[in-house]
Every structure is written in structure tokens, then in C-alpha cells.
């Protein structure tokens, strides 16, 4: 009998694994709608949708392993990281989906969210003021006009699977949509700066490294408090707070 394994669980959604099947439970069916549509449109390998019965989506497990995790050791050869970069470029060059995604928030919305979050981080004593101020300055470089691309929107390292030097699939598409391509590249390399050059080689075009670093700061500032409130530890070695400290 297959065991039921909890992959991730918090108040908004949960993912369970039973054998070779992942069960995604999400009370917000709009997120599942986005995920199913994005997987059908993406020109890269994605999990097979087995069935859907709200609030549950069942997808097949992917072959291979991830390149690592935030705060954990990174695995895979430089060629594997480059292959991931090439897959990301293929996604970004695809025809645009119909709606904006997490990577497509407007500059006005981002500035408002970022300023509010920075104030809360300091007034609630979550992070020291100098750390927040410095990273808010670094984040400014991400707040610029960009050309819309087909973006994943939550392209964490743990969401990309490889077998050897081949990408076997990308999972968790609920934040996909039109957005800033460099947001995806920054999310994928967050906490693993040592592999950024390999990813860019595979991506096949020059990118603005100041904007990548800005997204590292911006994304980390926006998620620290949420992570704490939902039972995760952004203060763990190599995680979001260490990313912020690296910008000092």
C-alpha cells in the first residue's frame, strides 16, 4: 500500500503524494484554473493531469529529481542548470497567455505592496531597519518597464525536474501568466547565485544582473512575513533572510 506523504500544507492549499500521484487541494479554484490552462499551453514538459474534482487536482509524478531546494544543497551539473535555462527561455518565447500572472504585477501595485511590507517588517520587529532599507534600495532596479513574456510566476528551484542533463518537467503553474521574464530567472536562482552564470548560458541572451539581484531582494522582502505566519522558516541558512543579508 502506498503511503500518503504531505509535500506542503498551509491554510491556503496543500499537496499530497500517494505513490506516483500528486493531489493538489486548493480552496481557490481560480488558481487551479490557471494551473491547468498554463500546463496545456506551456511549450515545456509539465505533469499529466489525471483528473480534477474540485477542490482537488490530481497530476502524475514527473521522472527525475529537482536541482535542489532553497536553503539546501544544489545538485546537477552545469549542463543541467544550462538546460533549465534553455527551457525557461523556450517558455518565455512562447505565445502569451491571456491573463497576467504573479510576475506581471504593475509597478504601481508592487511599489505599494513593497512599501507596506517594509514598514510592517520593521515596526513588527521581524527584520532590522538597516537590512530592510538596503534591500528596498536594491529592489528599486526591478521596478522598471518590461516586455511581457509567458512566465511561470513561481519558478522555485524545487519546481524544475531534471534527469541527468535533461529537463523532464516543471510543476506548480498556479501563478503563471504574462509577466517579467527576469522575475522567473531570479526566482529560479534565488539562494543559488553560484549557478546563475550556467542558467544564463542556457537562456541564451544577456540579462541585466542588477535586475536579477533586485528581484532577489524584492521577492524576499515580500514573502518573509508570510512564510513566518504560515509555519515556514525564512531565517534558515541559505533562505530568504540570508539572501537579504547578502545584499548588504
Q: What does each model-identified segment do?
A:
Residues 1, 14-19, 38-43, 49, ...:
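Alpha-helix C-terminal capping segments
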Residues 1, 63, 93-153, 204, ...:
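An alpha-helical support segment within catalytic cores of ATP-dependent transferases
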Residues 4-105:
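ATP-binding pocket architecture of kinase catalytic cores
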Residues 12-13, 178-181, 186-248:
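Helix-rich C-terminal or lid/interface subdomains of diverse kinases
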Residues 12-17, 23, 49, 136-185:
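Active-site acidic catalytic loop and adjacent metal/ATP-binding pocket
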Residues 30, 66, 160, 178, ...:
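Conserved protein kinase catalytic core
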Residues 42-43, 62, 70-71, 171, ...:
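Short, flexible helix/strand-to-coil boundary loops that buttress conserved ligand/catalytic motifs
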Amino acid at each position: 500500500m502506498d503511503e500518503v506523504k504531505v509535500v506542503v500544507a498551509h491554510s491556503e492549499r496543500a499537496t499530497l503524494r500517494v505513490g506516483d500521484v500528486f493531489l493538489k487541494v486548493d480552496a481557490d479554484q481560480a488558481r487551479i484554473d490557471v494551473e491547468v490552462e498554463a500546463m496545456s499551453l506551456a511549450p515545456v514538459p509539465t505533469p499529466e493531469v489525471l483528473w480534477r474534482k474540485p477542490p482537488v487536482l490530481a497530476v502524475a509524478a514527473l521522472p527525475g529529481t529537482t536541482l535542489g531546494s532553497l536553503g539546501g544543497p544544489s545538485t546537477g551539473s552545469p549542463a543541467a542548470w544550462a538546460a533549465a535555462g534553455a527551457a525557461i527561455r523556450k517558455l518565455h518565447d512562447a505565445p502569451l497567455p491571456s491573463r497576467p500572472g504573479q510576475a506581471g504585477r504593475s509597478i504601481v501595485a508592487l511599489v505599494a505592496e513593497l512599501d507596506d511590507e517594509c514598514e510592517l517588517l520593521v515596526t513588527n520587529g521581524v527584520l532590522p531597519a538597516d537590512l530592510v532599507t538596503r534591500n528596498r534600495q536594491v529592489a528599486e532596479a526591478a521596478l522598471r518597464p518590461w516586455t511581457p513574456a509567458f512566465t511561470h510566476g513561481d519558478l522555485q528551484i524545487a519546481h524544475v525536474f531534471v534527469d541527468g542533463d535533461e529537463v523532464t518537467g516543471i510543476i506548480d503553474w498556479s501563478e503563471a501568466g504574462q509577466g517579467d521574464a527576469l522575475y522567473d530567472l531570479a526566482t529560479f536562482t534565488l539562494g543559488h547565485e553560484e549557478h546563475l552564470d550556467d542558467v544564463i548560458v542556457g537562456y541564451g541572451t544577456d540579462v541585466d544582473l542588477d535586475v536579477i539581484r533586485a528581484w532577489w531582494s524584492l521577492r524576499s522582502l515580500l514573502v518573509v512575513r508570510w512564510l513566518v505566519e504560515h509555519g515556514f522558516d525564512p531565517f534558515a541558512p541559505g533562505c530568504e533572510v540570508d539572501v537579504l543579508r547578502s545584499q548588504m
